[in-house]
């Protein structure tokens, strides 16, 4: 039994760490590193021109054909960009390029880039010199202005700056362009407290000819690293594209997949998205039409995922509209679920999602009462421990009985010496006589590992944990303990637990078991502090429970002997 238990513990330790590394392989970013820019002493503003693009909007624009299953890239010549149009709400701070009307800059005022600089918001979109990430949209096809050989349309706006005023619930920003008797309005509608904005094209055809075009919307990103990633050494979250299909509500498309060639799907409704740590950006088309979804690389090597809608036809003297929604913000499951089916799955809890989702649901409800994620994790641990109390109690009783028969095991070892077969047979007979389950001590470990891994992914993926403080030196539960105090405490609790367990009769096994607290402490040094907190509390409760059961059985044994 002892060798089996030792092997199991070592194997689970290895599986845990390999599982984390496997997560890194499957979900981790395969991006090229970029130079990190230190935060300035003043909160930076959005620049007035789209730097890095030389003031141009020379992106690869998809062309629409009669068959919407194909959308080949079309090179458009560079057009000098005018000053950007700035828009600010209570949750968004963005800039729109008049050339094409793309959202080229976007910051999240409620999410600081660094915890020690709350005045510097996290920047989601950037079309500057360091990296490229923006949301593009336009009208292509037969008469679409974005398909012109002369370049994308240059829109005008009544103002250069828009801000949602106090008491104002919504705000509309309109961009206008006219050509060949056709008037175009590109309208952005913002609402207080929302990270999604509605983009509407109004085509007013005052020409003598019918107008036909296709709406396209896409997300363009280079291969730079994830600026929102705060994970530890050996771990990472998924950085890449994803889309919805009827057969697969959450289909990831990595940069490597896009490198292999274009991916094309005909999808009714759905969404296309770009995922990174804690945040997601998604274009959501009209759910009532079938759109051509595709991924590709443009001429500059940027990765693109987007869709092209069916042809919109507008007769002379008539108006036509087409709409899409852009979401750019945190991975809030409740909000994403309301926006579009399957979008909440971008909060990726891995293969143990069926355990992780209930854990997060319970954790949220506890936090609603306590208001602190650290204390919420402690209460959650106590509830989980209470749930498995009967199973743990049976296991600890088995280990207590084994500790009581340890002297008898020593006698058997002296009797049978190096004859392992006879020793094993004698041990099993003794266990049967004493009514001991030789594998009983392994059950708590087996039960805890899925919960442990699920909580790890909850802490890693849930934006609610980002920069969430507990007490004293733990100012962010989503990253490692800066002073490694919790991992050391965790190692100490493991050592105390070992003292309560029966010593393996094999000296080699005993040495391996003594090394386990050191090995686990090393693993936990870089784990999120919230996860280590869970393990510390769990171990502490286990020690109390095991000590109580051991004393109780010891007292009963002495009473029976008397």
UniProtKB/Swiss-Prot annotation:
Residues 42-74 are annotated as: Disordered. The chain crosses the membrane at residues 1-21, 343-363, 369-389, 439-459, 470-490, 517-537. It is found in: Cell inner membrane. Signal peptide: none annotated. It comes from the Bacteria. GO terms for biological process: protein insertion into membrane; protein transport. One of its GO terms (molecular function) is membrane insertase activity. Pfam families: 60KD_IMP, YidC_periplas. Required for the insertion and/or proper folding and/or complex formation of integral membrane proteins into the membrane. Involved in integration of membrane proteins that insert both dependently and independently of the Sec translocase complex, as well as at least some lipoproteins. Aids folding of multispanning membrane proteins. This is Membrane protein insertase YidC. It comes from Pseudomonas syringae pv. tomato (strain ATCC BAA-871 / DC3000).
């Amino acid at each position: 039994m002892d060798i089996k238990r030792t092997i199991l513990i070592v194997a689970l330790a290895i599986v845990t760490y390999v599982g984390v590394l496997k997560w890194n392989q499957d979900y981790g970013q395969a991006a090229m590193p970029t130079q990190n820019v230190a935060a300035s002493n003043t909160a930076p503003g959005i620049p007035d021109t789209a730097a890095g693009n030389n003031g141009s909007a020379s992106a690869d624009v998809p062309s629409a054909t009669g068959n919407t299953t194909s959308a080949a890239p079309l090179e458009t010549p560079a057009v000098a960009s005018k000053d950007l149009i700035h828009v600010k709400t209570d949750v968004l701070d963005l800039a729109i390029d008049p050339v094409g009307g793309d959202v080229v800059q976007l910051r999240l005022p409620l999410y600081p880039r660094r915890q020690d600089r709350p005045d510097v918001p996290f920047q989601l979109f950037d079309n500057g010199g360091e990296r490229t990430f923006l949301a593009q949209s336009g009208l292509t096809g037969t008469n679409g202005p974005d398909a012109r050989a002369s370049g994308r349309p240059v829109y005008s706006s009544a103002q250069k700056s828009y801000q949602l005023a106090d008491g104002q619930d919504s705000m509309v920003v309109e961009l206008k362009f006219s050509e060949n008797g056709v008037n175009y309005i590109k309208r952005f509608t913002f609402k207080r407290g929302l990270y999604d904005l509605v983009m509407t094209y109004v085509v007013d055809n005052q020409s003598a000819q019918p107008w036909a075009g296709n709406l396209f919307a896409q997300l363009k990103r280079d291969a730079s690293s994830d600026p929102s990633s705060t994970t530890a050494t050996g771990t990472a979250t998924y950085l890449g594209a994803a889309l919805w299909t009827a057969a697969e509500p959450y289909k990831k498309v990595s940069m490597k997949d896009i490198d292999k060639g274009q991916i094309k799907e005909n999808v009714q409704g759905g969404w296309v998205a770009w995922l990174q740590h804690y945040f997601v950006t998604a274009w959501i088309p009209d759910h009532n039409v079938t759109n051509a979804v595709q991924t590709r690389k443009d001429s500059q090597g940027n990765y693109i995922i987007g869709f092209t809608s069916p042809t919109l036809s507008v007769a002379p003297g008539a108006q036509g509209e087409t709409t899409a929604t852009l979401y750019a913000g945190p991975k809030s499951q409740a909000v994403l679920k309301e926006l579009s089916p399957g979008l909440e799955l971008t909060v990726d809890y891995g293969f143990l999602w069926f355990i992780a989702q209930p854990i997060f649901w319970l954790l949220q409800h506890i936090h609603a009462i306590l208001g602190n994620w650290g204390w919420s994790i402690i209460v959650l641990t106590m509830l989980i421990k209470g749930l498995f109390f009967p199973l743990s109690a049976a296991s600890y009783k088995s280990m207590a009985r084994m500790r009581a028969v340890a002297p008898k095991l020593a006698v058997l070892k002296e009797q049978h010496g190096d004859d392992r077969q006879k020793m094993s047979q004698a041990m099993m007979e003794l266990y049967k006589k004493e009514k001991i389950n030789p594998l009983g001590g392994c059950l708590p470990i087996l039960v805890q590992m899925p919960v442990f891994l699920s909580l790890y992914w909850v802490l890693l993926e849930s934006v609610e944990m980002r920069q969430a403080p507990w007490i004293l030196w733990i100012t962010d539960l989503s990253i490692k303990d800066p002073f490694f105090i919790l991992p050391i405490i965790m190692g100490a609790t493991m050592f105390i637990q070992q003292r309560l367990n029966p010593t393996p009769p094999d000296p080699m096994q005993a040495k391996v078991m003594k090394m386990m607290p050191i090995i686990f402490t090393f693993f936990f040094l870089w784990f999120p502090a919230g996860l280590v907190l869970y393990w510390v509390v769990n171990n502490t409760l286990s020690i109390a429970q095991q000590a109580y059961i051991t004393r109780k059985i010891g007292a009963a044994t002495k009473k029976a002997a008397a």
